[in-house]
């Protein structure tokens, strides 16, 4: 993480260093959501081969998504904290089969200018207490 937003995810850890998979890599996938009160749009953000942009995929057709929306990590997978800035939607369109929405995203962090990053370690998703009757608190 840099002050501009998410740069990538730790891919491999060694004794003295860690290898980071950049967010712009086609191999990188992060749970994401729209940061707008009237939108419940969620999807998966990741890199596009040969481009410096991101693609937000797997968004329900009915979800509210528009150009200019701010995209943040969703935190739903439990592998990343929620609400880390990813980027901004520059265009929306339907997927190749016309069933789901997709969005082009410009990354918030200028990865070409990154010199130092903050690595979040020891992240543990909030535990839920299961009450009698199966409801989580």
Per-range role (PLM):
Residues 1-137:
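A secondary-structure micro-motif
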């Amino acid at each position: 993480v840099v002050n501009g937003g998410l740069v990538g995810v730790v891919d491999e850890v060694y004794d003295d260093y860690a290898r980071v998979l950049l967010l712009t890599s086609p191999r990188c996938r992060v749970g994401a959501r729209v940061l707008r009160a009237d939108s419940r749009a969620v999807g998966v953000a990741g890199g596009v081969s040969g481009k410096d942009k991101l693609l937000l995929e797997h968004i329900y057709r009915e979800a509210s998504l528009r150009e200019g929306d701010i995209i943040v990590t969703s935190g739903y997978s439990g592998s990343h904290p929620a609400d880390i800035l990813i980027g901004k939607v520059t265009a929306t369109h339907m997927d190749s089969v016309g069933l789901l929405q997709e969005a082009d995203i410009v990354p918030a962090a200028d990865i070409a200018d990154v010199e130092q990053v903050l690595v979040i370690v020891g992240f543990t998703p909030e535990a839920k207490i299961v009450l009698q009757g199966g409801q989580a608190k």
